């Protein structure tokens, strides 16, 4: 199975990884894992004076902070995983990557906001569900 794990470094990411760890059938060399972290692009005044190379380094460093404990999780279990930093609209970037990689499943944590909050503000999980053609498993 080709599994994409969308991570953001939040406690919900930790819960998702915990769920994967507790369910042995999710782990193993028979699966292919891609771990993605998506960052919205810096725009406006903050981005205008920054060298594009420096900006890419900033995005990469932020993603590495999120990836570090997850990379350790996979390495401790002897499981290979591909780590990808995406820069763009978060939900759209995650959904497109899952489709591009022909993933069988996209797994992500969810904050579990209520209907009203999602209706007014939206959420990454809600947007991924709406825009992704790949099956999505939300862990709360």
Predicted regions and their residues:
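Glycine-rich, Arg-bearing micro-motifs that act as flexible, cationic patches
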Residues: 105-130
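Small/aliphatic-rich secondary-structure junction motif
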Residues: 1-49, 77
């Amino acid at each position: 199975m080709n599994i994409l794990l969308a991570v953001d470094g939040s406690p919900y990411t930790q819960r998702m990884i915990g769920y994967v760890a507790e369910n042995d059938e999710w782990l193993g060399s028979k699966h292919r894992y891609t771990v993605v972290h998506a960052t919205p692009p810096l725009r406006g005044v903050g981005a205008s004076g920054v060298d594009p190379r420096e900006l890419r380094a900033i995005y990469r460093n932020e993603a590495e902070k999120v990836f570090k404990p997850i990379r350790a999780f996979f390495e401790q279990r002897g499981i290979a995983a591909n780590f990808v930093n995406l820069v763009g609209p978060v939900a759209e970037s995650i959904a497109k990557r899952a489709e591009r990689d022909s993933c069988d499943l996209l797994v992500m944590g969810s904050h579990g906001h209520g209907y009203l909050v999602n209706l007014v503000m939206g959420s990454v999980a809600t947007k991924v569900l709406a825009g992704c053609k790949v099956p999505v498993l939300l862990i709360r």
